[in-house]
Structure formats: structure tokens, C-alpha cells
């Protein structure tokens, strides 16, 4: 699926989606200088242009057509946008905005009422400021010996996408390294609530009998997860659904799982793989904003 390269088109859609998702002002007594709709659209454009707050303000000051589209009489100070990011990108508001992008895709008949095939995946993002932590692992057979292993913390994004349209229907943001398998249920439930799913595919990182049971029995979603996790063995898995994956693995449908990798590539290519925010919560907001920007650029 192609993405828009027009900042005017992106601004129009971002502005419209914000109007459907958010009240004009956060509080009746708040300063009525800029609407939340205008500020959200500007945050999307920040991602589109891959600029910092100061850089975006400079672009908007020179771009009268964008100001006209957003009904913006005065260009906000960059600190106004920084504060707006904290206020507009709370978890609840992100979900509301994500749901509105999905409805927008349905409105233009890009997305159907349900996803016949979806895929889960995760990726690490580049951060300019990364911290290290140390893990001490007791060496096997040595009672008081420890092995020190160094890891690099990085912003991590997990998502679910519709394989046909590349629209993202669910997201989780956090820190890596972390196992994918523990996020499967939360991410799948969120995505299924946003857009009903018929079949879900996922790589071996999400493989567990518990995840199959949750998808198939709790949500009534057909799950196809690569069963080749853990040490290689000739023994069949003991679980019903993991055994089915070994004996009757649907290679054709699972082959479409690469569409999620395409979405990750689109995100990093169009909106940068770098996360410029320095602290954890700002990084979470920036990753969520990339997802919203991706969907808006598609519609």
C-alpha cells in the first residue's frame, strides 16, 4: 500500500481525524488560542517532516497552505507543541485516535468491516540516548560464579496490521529487550476490539499453547504461529494447537506474515527508525505518533 507524500493531504486527514476523536479544547477554561485538533495535526506533520519541534515551527511559518488548511492564524511556539504532545498522546487518546484512523480507512472503502488476515510483529527502534543494564547469570554447575552480560535498552514497538492494506490496528510500546510471547494476548485483544480479525499470524517469538488457546477459544480467531520455538526436537508438542501447527501448518497463509515486516519497513523508511525523545514516556508517545502518522499517510 502506498503512502501519501503530500503534507497538505496529511494535514487535512490529521485535522479531520482529530475533530472526530477529540474535543476542541481540553478544558472550558483553558486558553482558546489553539484547538487540540490543530495541535494534533501539527504533531503528525512533525513526524511527516521528520523534524524536531523548532524545525516544524519554521516549516509551518513558511508554509501558508498548511496554515490555511488548519485554520491557523498564529504559528505556535515550539514549547506549546511539546506540552501538547504530553496532553494529547495519553494511552486512552492514542487508542481513540487509532480507532478513528481505522474508521477513516473503512469510510473510504480501503478497509473492510473485519480483517480476514492480520499479522503481529515487533521491532526495536534506534534511540540516541540508550542506557545499559547488567544481568548476572549464575553459571551452570558453579555455585557462586556469575557471568556478567551487557544489554542495550532500546525503544520497542509491537503492532498488529491488516495484511491486505497495511493499516495498523493495534500497538504496544515499551522497552526492549523483552520477550514477544508475553505481549501476544494484550495486543491481539486490543487489535480485535478495534477491527475484528478472522485469522492471525505470528512468528515463533509468540509461540505458546496458551496464546493459541486465547486466540481460538476466547476470541474465536484462527491462529497460525510458527511452532519452531525452543530447542529443536523430533517429538510432537503436547498441546493440541501447537501439535496442529506441526502436523497441518498453513504455509500459504503464514507466508503473508511478511506483510507485517513490510509495515515495519514503511514506518522506518517514511518516518525514520530513530526515536529522538530522551526519556521513557516521551519515547512511548513518539512511537505511538509514528503509528498514527503511518495510518493517516495511507488514508
Q: Model-found features: residue ranges?
A:
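Major-groove recognition helix of helix-turn-helix-like DNA-binding domains
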Residues: 69-89
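Basic, amphipathic alpha-helical segments enriched in Lys/Arg and hydrophobic/aromatic residues
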Residues: 250-299
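Mobile genetic element proteins and their domesticated derivatives, centered on retroelements
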Residues: 42, 56, 77, 81, ...
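DNA-recognition alpha helix
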Residues: 54-70
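Helix-centered, glycine/charged polyanion-binding patches within enzymatic domains
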Residues: 204-271
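Basic, short loop/linker segments at the boundary and entry of helix-turn-helix/winged-helix-like folds
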Residues: 2-49
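Polybasic low-complexity intrinsically disordered regions
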Residues: 31, 37, 48, 90-217
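Non-catalytic DNA-binding core/recognition domains of DNA-processing enzymes
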Residues: 38, 60-62, 77
Amino acid at each position: 500500500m502506498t503512502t501519501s507524500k503530500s503534507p497538505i493531504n496529511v494535514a487535512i486527514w490529521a485535522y479531520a481525524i482529530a475533530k472526530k476523536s477529540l474535543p476542541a479544547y481540553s478544558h472550558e477554561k483553558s486558553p482558546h488560542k489553539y484547538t487540540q485538533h490543530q495541535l494534533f495535526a501539527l504533531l503528525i506533520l512533525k513526524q511527516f517532516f521528520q523534524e524536531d519541534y523548532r524545525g516544524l515551527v519554521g516549516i509551518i511559518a513558511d508554509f501558508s497552505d498548511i496554515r490555511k488548511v488548519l485554520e491557523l492564524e498564529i504559528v505556535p511556539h515550539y514549547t506549546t507543541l511539546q506540552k501538547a504532545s504530553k496532553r494529547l498522546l495519553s494511552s486512552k487518546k492514542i487508542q481513540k485516535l487509532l480507532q478513528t484512523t481505522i474508521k477513516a480507512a473503512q469510510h473510504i472503502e480501503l478497509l473492510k468491516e473485519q480483517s480476514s488476515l492480520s499479522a503481529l510483529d515487533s521491532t526495536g527502534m534506534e534511540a540516541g540516548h540508550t542506557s545499559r543494564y547488567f544481568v548476572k547469570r549464575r553459571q551452570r554447575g558453579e555455585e557462586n560464579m556469575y557471568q556478567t552480560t551487557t544489554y542495550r535498552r532500546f525503544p520497542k514497538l509491537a503492532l498488529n496490521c491488516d495484511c491486505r492494506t497495511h493499516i495498523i490496528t493495534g500497538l504496544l510500546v515499551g522497552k526492549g529487550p523483552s520477550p514477544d510471547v508475553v505481549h501476544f494476548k494484550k495486543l491481539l485483544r486490543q487489535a480485535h476490539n478495534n477491527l475484528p480479525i478472522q485469522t492471525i499470524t505470528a512468528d515463533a517469538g509468540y509461540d505458546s499453547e496458551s496464546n493459541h488457546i486465547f486466540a481460538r477459544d476466547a476470541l474465536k480467531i484462527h491462529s497460525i504461529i510458527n511452532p519452531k520455538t525452543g530447542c529443536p526436537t523430533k517429538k510432537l508438542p503436547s498441546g493440541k494447537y501447537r501439535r496442529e501447527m506441526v502436523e497441518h501448518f498453513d504455509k500459504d497463509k503464514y507466508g503473508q506474515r511478511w506483510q507485517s515486516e513490510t509495515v515495519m519497513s514503511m514506518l522506518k523508511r517514511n518516518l525514520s527508525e530513530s526515536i529522538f525523545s530522551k526519556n521513557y514516556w516521551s519515547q512511548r508517545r513518539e512511537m505511538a505518533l509514528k503509528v498514527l502518522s503511518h495510518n493517516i499517510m495511507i488514508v
